Amino acid sequence: MGKISSLPTQLFKCCFCDFLKQVKMPITSSSHLFYLALCLLAFTSSATAGPETLCGAELVDALQFVCGDRGFYFNKPTGYGSSSRRAPQTGIVDECCFRSCDLRRLEMYCAPLKPAKSARSVRAQRHTDMPKAQKEVHLKNTSRGSAGNKNYRM
């Protein structure tokens, strides 16, 4: 999966390509220079801007996108850097809503992958699986006890 560019970065690339096409013309007007300055400003503001925070529905959407079918936790599952001392537990909201977080931080809250179910062989199914009707008959016969079909009067 490729790196996702921010909107200002994409805008700069588009502006810069357009400007280079226009520079080939011998006349450079002040509007062209203004256009270039605007593009440079957009690029530098995107370079200095830090990661954004995710809260509420945006946080849930981001987790669903990153984790997919695995699902996710709002608190870190046990075993993620837990020490012997009980530290105050922080969750995804503390890490990504109150502070900014990156993709790796979001991935830490994904549920583990479930192992793929292995296909059982046909031979194993023949010997272990009985049709439902046979199971019911088998259960009826075993529930009579050791007396069989004999009726005892008392």
UniProtKB/Swiss-Prot annotation:
<dbReference type="GO" id="GO:0008083">
    <property type="term" value="F:growth factor activity"/>
</dbReference>
<dbReference type="GO" id="GO:0034392">
    <property type="term" value="P:negative regulation of smooth muscle cell apoptotic process"/>
</dbReference>
<feature type="compositionally biased region" description="Polar residues">
    <location>
        <begin position="140"/>
        <end position="154"/>
    </location>
</feature>
<dbReference type="GO" id="GO:0051602">
    <property type="term" value="P:response to electrical stimulus"/>
</dbReference>
<feature type="region of interest" description="Disordered">
    <location>
        <begin position="121"/>
        <end position="154"/>
    </location>
</feature>
<dbReference type="InterPro" id="IPR022353">
    <property type="entry name" value="Insulin_CS"/>
</dbReference>
<keyword id="KW-0732">Signal</keyword>
<comment type="similarity">
    <text>Belongs to the insulin family.</text>
</comment>
<dbReference type="GO" id="GO:0071000">
    <property type="term" value="P:response to magnetism"/>
</dbReference>
<dbReference type="GO" id="GO:0046326">
    <property type="term" value="P:positive regulation of D-glucose import"/>
</dbReference>
<feature type="disulfide bond">
    <location>
        <begin position="67"/>
        <end position="110"/>
    </location>
</feature>
<dbReference type="GO" id="GO:0051897">
    <property type="term" value="P:positive regulation of phosphatidylinositol 3-kinase/protein kinase B signal transduction"/>
</dbReference>
<dbReference type="GO" id="GO:0008284">
    <property type="term" value="P:positive regulation of cell population proliferation"/>
</dbReference>
<dbReference type="GO" id="GO:0032094">
    <property type="term" value="P:response to food"/>
</dbReference>
<dbReference type="InterPro" id="IPR022350">
    <property type="entry name" value="Insulin-like_growth_factor"/>
</dbReference>
<dbReference type="GO" id="GO:0032868">
    <property type="term" value="P:response to insulin"/>
</dbReference>
<feature type="disulfide bond">
    <location>
        <begin position="55"/>
        <end position="97"/>
    </location>
</feature>
<dbReference type="Pfam" id="PF00049">
    <property type="entry name" value="Insulin"/>
</dbReference>
<dbReference type="GO" id="GO:0043066">
    <property type="term" value="P:negative regulation of apoptotic process"/>
</dbReference>
<dbReference type="InterPro" id="IPR036438">
    <property type="entry name" value="Insulin-like_sf"/>
</dbReference>
<feature type="propeptide" description="E peptide">
    <location>
        <begin position="120"/>
        <end position="154"/>
    </location>
</feature>
<dbReference type="InterPro" id="IPR016179">
    <property type="entry name" value="Insulin-like"/>
</dbReference>
<dbReference type="GO" id="GO:1903408">
    <property type="term" value="P:positive regulation of P-type sodium:potassium-exchanging transporter activity"/>
</dbReference>
<dbReference type="GO" id="GO:0005615">
    <property type="term" value="C:extracellular space"/>
</dbReference>
<dbReference type="GO" id="GO:0060416">
    <property type="term" value="P:response to growth hormone"/>
</dbReference>
<dbReference type="GO" id="GO:0070382">
    <property type="term" value="C:exocytic vesicle"/>
</dbReference>
<dbReference type="GO" id="GO:0043410">
    <property type="term" value="P:positive regulation of MAPK cascade"/>
</dbReference>
<keyword id="KW-0964">Secreted</keyword>
<protein>
    <recommendedName>
        <fullName>Insulin-like growth factor 1</fullName>
    </recommendedName>
</protein>
<feature type="region of interest" description="D">
    <location>
        <begin position="112"/>
        <end position="119"/>
    </location>
</feature>
<feature type="region of interest" description="B">
    <location>
        <begin position="50"/>
        <end position="78"/>
    </location>
</feature>
<dbReference type="GO" id="GO:0035867">
    <property type="term" value="C:alphav-beta3 integrin-IGF-1-IGF1R complex"/>
</dbReference>
<dbReference type="GO" id="GO:0005179">
    <property type="term" value="F:hormone activity"/>
</dbReference>
<feature type="disulfide bond">
    <location>
        <begin position="96"/>
        <end position="101"/>
    </location>
</feature>
<feature type="region of interest" description="A">
    <location>
        <begin position="91"/>
        <end position="111"/>
    </location>
</feature>
<dbReference type="GO" id="GO:0090201">
    <property type="term" value="P:negative regulation of release of cytochrome c from mitochondria"/>
</dbReference>
<dbReference type="GO" id="GO:1903407">
    <property type="term" value="P:negative regulation of P-type sodium:potassium-exchanging transporter activity"/>
</dbReference>
<comment type="subunit">
    <text>Forms a ternary complex with IGFR1 and ITGAV:ITGB3. Forms a ternary complex with IGFR1 and ITGA6:ITGB4. Forms a ternary complex with IGFBP3 and ALS.</text>
</comment>
<dbReference type="GO" id="GO:0005159">
    <property type="term" value="F:insulin-like growth factor receptor binding"/>
</dbReference>
<keyword id="KW-1015">Disulfide bond</keyword>
<dbReference type="InterPro" id="IPR022352">
    <property type="entry name" value="Insulin_family"/>
</dbReference>
<dbReference type="InterPro" id="IPR022341">
    <property type="entry name" value="IGF-I"/>
</dbReference>
